[in-house]
C-alpha cells in the first residue's frame, strides 16, 4: 500500500512538472500520454486489490481505468506515427494533442486553428447554431502517412480536400431539418454573412449535393446583410412577445393578433373605468341629495367631514404611488389577497412586472449570474436559472441559453441597465409578463 502510494505520488509530480514546463513539442506530448497510461494502470491495480484511495485521490472503477488506459495507448500510437512524418517539428500543444480535440469532427485527425461559424436557420438570428471549424487538418492516409490540408466552409458545411474528394465533417443540412422549416440557412463567419441561400440555385433540404456549394451572395444583398448583422449583434428593443417563433406563418399570425388583443384589453379597462366613474358620481349625488334630510339633528355635519377626510386620503395615496395613464389596463393577471386595501390592489394590477432577457452561451450566463447577484444585490427582484427553448415535437434545445431578470419598476430596470456590463456574446432585450 505504501509503495503504491509512493509510486502514484512520483507519477503525479512528473505530470505537474510537464504541465508547468509548457513545452510545445511532439516528444513532450508523447511522454504526457505515457504518464497518463501509467496512472490508469496504477488505478486499475489498486482497485483490483480493494484499495479505494491513493493519497487524496479516489480510485475509479475498473471499467473506467481500463477505458482511459486504452485511450492513452491509442493516443500514444497516433502521436508516435505523427512523429515519423514531416510535421513532427511543428509546435504541438496539450490542447491540440488532447483526446477531445482528436475525437471532435473530423474524428481521428489532428487539428489546428479553431474558428467559430454561426448558422442562422430560416434566416432568423434567434434560431442560431455555433460550429467549430478548423484552419488546418492533419489526416492519416491508407499507407499510414500524414497529410496536412486547409479547412474550408461553404453553404453545405465544413470540409477539407482529401486527395481529389471533398470530405465534409460538418453538414448544416442535418440541423436544418431539425431546427428549420424552410430548408434554407445563412452561414456567418466573424459576424459577416459569407453564404446566403439563393432561390434560383439552392436546392431544398435533402436534395443538396455533397460536392456542390452555392456561390456567395451578390453585392445587391449587402444592405440586407448589414441590417441582419446589426440586428443580431446590436442592442435592440424587444417585440411585444419575447418568445422565439420558428415557424414563419405562426410568427406572422401572432404579429397580427398581438395588437388586437391589447386594444381589446385596453378598451375593456376603459369601459370599466367609465362605468365605475358614473357609478361614483351617482352615489355622491345621491348622498348629497339625502344629506339635508338625514342631518336634521347635526347628522349632516359628521357625514360631510368623514367624506372629505376619505377624499383627501385617497388623493394623497394616489399622488404618492400612482400609475401613469399609458400603463393602466396593460395586464391580465389576478391580484392576490396579501394587500390591505382596494387601492393597493388596483395600483398593483395597473402594470406588469418589467423583465430583461439575456441570451448567450450557458457557461457564460451562469458565471455572469453569479457576478450579477453579488454586484447588483438589492437592485432587482428575481433572476432565473439558465434555460432554453425546445421544439414542439422534440426535446432538443434550440438556439442559445437564456436568463430572465425581473424588476419592481421600469426605473429600477433602466438604472440597472446603465450599470450592467454584459460579457462578450451576451445580448439583452426588454420584456413584460402578466405575472411572475
From Swiss-Prot:
Post-translational modifications reported in the UniProt record: Phosphorylated.
Source taxon at top rank: Viruses
Keywords: Activator, DNA replication, DNA-binding, Early protein, Host nucleus, Phosphoprotein, Repressor, Transcription, Transcription regulation
Gene Ontology terms: cellular component: host cell nucleus
GO molecular function: DNA binding; DNA-binding transcription factor activity; nucleotide binding
Annotated region described as Disordered, given as residue ranges: 195-328
GO aspect biological process, one term: regulation of DNA replication
Biased composition range(s): Basic and acidic residues: 284-293
Intrachain disulfide bonds: none
Compositional bias annotation for Polar residues: 210-230
InterPro entries (UniProt xref): E2/EBNA1_C_sf, Nucleotide-bd_a/b_plait_sf, Papillomavirus_E2_C, PPV_E2_N, Reg_prot_E2, Regulatory_protein_E2_N, Regulatory_protein_E2_N_1, Regulatory_protein_E2_N_2
Cited Gene3D superfamilies: 3.30.70.330, E2 (early) protein, N terminal domain, subdomain 1, Papillomavirus E2 early protein domain
Protein's cellular compartments: Host nucleus
Region annotation (Transactivation domain) ranges: 1-201
Region (DNA-binding domain): 352-436
Composition skew (Low complexity), residue ranges: 195-209
Free-text function comment from the UniProt entry: Plays a role in the initiation of viral DNA replication. A dimer of E2 interacts with a dimer of E1 in order to improve specificity of E1 DNA binding activity. Once the complex recognizes and binds DNA at specific sites, the E2 dimer is removed from DNA. E2 also regulates viral transcription through binding to the E2RE response element (5'-ACCNNNNNNGGT-3') present in multiple copies in the regulatory regions of the viral genome. Activates or represses transcription depending on E2RE's position with regards to proximal promoter elements including the TATA-box.
Record-stated family: Belongs to the papillomaviridae E2 protein family.
Subunit structure: Binds DNA as homodimer. Interacts with protein E1; this interaction greatly increases E1 DNA-binding activity. Interacts with protein L1; this interaction enhances E2-dependent replication and transcription activation. Interacts with protein L2; this interaction inhibits E2 transcriptional activity but not DNA replication function E2. Interacts with protein E7; this interaction inhibits E7 oncogenic activity. Interacts with host TAF1; this interaction modulates E2-dependent transcriptional regulation. Interacts with host BRD4; this interaction mediates E2 transcriptional activation function.
Protein's recorded name: Regulatory protein E2
Species name: Human papillomavirus 22
Amino acid at each position: 500500500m505504501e509503495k503504491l502510494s509512493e509510486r502514484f505520488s512520483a507519477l503525479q509530480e512528473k505530470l505537474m512538472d510537464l504541465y508547468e514546463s509548457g513545452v510545445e513539442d511532439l516528444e513532450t506530448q508523447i511522454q504526457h500520454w505515457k504518464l497518463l497510461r501509467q496512472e490508469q494502470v496504477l488505478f486499475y491495480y489498486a482497485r483490483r486489490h480493494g484499495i479505494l484511495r491513493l493519497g487524496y485521490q479516489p480510485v475509479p472503477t475498473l471499467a473506467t481505468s481500463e477505458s482511459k488506459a486504452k485511450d492513452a495507448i491509442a493516443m500514444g500510437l497516433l502521436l508516435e506515427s505523427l512523429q515519423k512524418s514531416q510535421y513532427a517539428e511543428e509546435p504541438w500543444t496539450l490542447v491540440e494533442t488532447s483526446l477531445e480535440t482528436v475525437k471532435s469532427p473530423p474524428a481521428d485527425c489532428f487539428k489546428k486553428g479553431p474558428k467559430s461559424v454561426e448558422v442562422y436557420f430560416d434566416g432568423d438570428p434567434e434560431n442560431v447554431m455555433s460550429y467549430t471549424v478548423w484552419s488546418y487538418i492533419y489526416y492519416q492516409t491508407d499507407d499510414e502517412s500524414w497529410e496536412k490540408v486547409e479547412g474550408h466552409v461553404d453553404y453545405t458545411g465544413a470540409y477539407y480536400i482529401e486527395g481529389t474528394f471533398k470530405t465534409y465533417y460538418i453538414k448544416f443540412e442535418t440541423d436544418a431539418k431539425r431546427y428549420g422549416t424552410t430548408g434554407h440557412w445563412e452561414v456567418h463567419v466573424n459576424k459577416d454573412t459569407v453564404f446566403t441561400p439563393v432561390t434560383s440555385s439552392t436546392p431544398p433540404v435533402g436534395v443538396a449535393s455533397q460536392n456542390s456549394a452555392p456561390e456567395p451572395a451578390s453585392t445587391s444583398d449587402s444592405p440586407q446583410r448589414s441590417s441582419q448583422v446589426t440586428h443580431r449583434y446590436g442592442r435592440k428593443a424587444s417585440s411585444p412577445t419575447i418568445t422565439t417563433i420558428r415557424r414563419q406563418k405562426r410568427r406572422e399570425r401572432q404579429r397580427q393578433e398581438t395588437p388586437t388583443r391589447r386594444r381589446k384589453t385596453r378598451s375593456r379597462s376603459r369601459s370599466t373605468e367609465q362605468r365605475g366613474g358614473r357609478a361614483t358620481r351617482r352615489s355622491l349625488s345621491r348622498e348629497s341629495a339625502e344629506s339635508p334630510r338625514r342631518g336634521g339633528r347635526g347628522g349632516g355635519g359628521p357625514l360631510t367631514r368623514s367624506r372629505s377626510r376619505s377624499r383627501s386620503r385617497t388623493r394623497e395615496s394616489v399622488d404618492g404611488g400612482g400609475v401613469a395613464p399609458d400603463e393602466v389596463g396593460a395586464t391580465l393577471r389576478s391580484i392576490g389577497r396579501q394587500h390591505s386595501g382596494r387601492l393597493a390592489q388596483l395600483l398593483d394590477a395597473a402594470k406588469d412586472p418589467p423583465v430583461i432577457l439575456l441570451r448567450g452561451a450557458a457557461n457564460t450566463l451562469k458565471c455572469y449570474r453569479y457576478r450579477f447577484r453579488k454586484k447588483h444585490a438589492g437592485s432587482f427582484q428575481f433572476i432565473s436559472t439558465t434555460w432554453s427553448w425546445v421544439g414542439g415535437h422534440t426535446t432538443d434545445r434550440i438556439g442559445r441559453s437564456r436568463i430572465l431578470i425581473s424588476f419592481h419598476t421600469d426605473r429600477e430596470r433602466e438604472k440597472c441597465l446603465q450599470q450592467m456590463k454584459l460579457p462578450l456574446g451576451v445580448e439583452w432585450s426588454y420584456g413584460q409578463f402578466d405575472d411572475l
